[in-house]
């Protein structure tokens, strides 16, 4: 067998075979047939030991040259077939079709409401203050006129870490911290998370609250009423009716709870012929608590209650969101149901 002639014949033979390969799979079959472990080149080289020792180097060098030529032919044909495949795919592409829109996220409804509330009070000249969620007993209770054993502490199911360290039950401690660091006039709101040991259809262990307060000379209940009425009508609409009811909070005196006309039934107490489940036919829903800052609180922060007066108020952000958007179950805010959350996109 003339091995040199056999080797030289492989190149034109492969060129004819590659011309018939119309897909990458057929091309791979040709590559295996010529360059595989049992391919044509390997079969020819299997006769190399039969040659005289002096001829083997010349045949081996020729085999390497042929192998390189075969490999180049395969690569060239592969490029051609890949380009043809890509062109075929592009020929089916219709640029006039609408594209696939990327998934769009949105802010959480609680975040939306909190930002709206902060925006309203920001326009009224209030600063935004923040502080620790892990609080001490003094700032959370004692400085707010709730000494140890005070019955008002029972109103809040507190999560204690140690005997004197706890998860804050309201954002009112920021009122104390801010007044300690600033001299009047002071006007600020304190948004943030608060924690209580409670969980049902209207309560969660963690929720969001905003505390607001103003301190200056001759601040009155009339200013409190005007501020909150303006705020509530901005958030819920200009036709919203607002009423103040006497109440009790240990850190304000006098104290009041604020109701607004029901957003669901429009203050009528019924929806069609059915009683309103939100306001329970009264036409009113409670929205926040407020009052004039107690003189004992002023004393704890070094303000002279004979010189300064001020008001404070607090509201739950989730409650505002529930009323604003007509949501019946507080827990829906925290269940991460995309079908629910995407409504606010």
UniProtKB/Swiss-Prot annotation:
Binds 2 magnesium ions per tetramer. PROSITE patterns: AA_TRNA_LIGASE_II (PS50862). GO terms for cellular component: cytoplasm. Its cofactor is Mg(2+). It is found in: Cytoplasm. Mg(2+) binds at residue 253. One of its GO terms (molecular function) is phenylalanine-tRNA ligase activity. Its EC number is 6.1.1.20. It catalyses: tRNA(Phe) + L-phenylalanine + ATP = L-phenylalanyl-tRNA(Phe) + AMP + diphosphate + H(+). Keywords: Aminoacyl-tRNA synthetase, ATP-binding, Cytoplasm, Ligase, Magnesium, Metal-binding, Nucleotide-binding, Protein biosynthesis. It is an enzyme of class 6 (ligase). GO terms for biological process: phenylalanyl-tRNA aminoacylation. Gene3D superfamilies: Bira Bifunctional Protein, Domain 2 (3.30.930.10). It comes from the Bacteria. Tetramer of two alpha and two beta subunits. Belongs to the class-II aminoacyl-tRNA synthetase family. Phe-tRNA synthetase alpha subunit type 1 subfamily. PANTHER family: PHENYLALANINE--TRNA LIGASE, MITOCHONDRIAL, PHENYLALANYL-TRNA SYNTHETASE. This is Phenylalanine--tRNA ligase alpha subunit. It comes from Nitratidesulfovibrio vulgaris (strain ATCC 29579 / DSM 644 / CCUG 34227 / NCIMB 8303 / VKM B-1760 / Hildenborough).
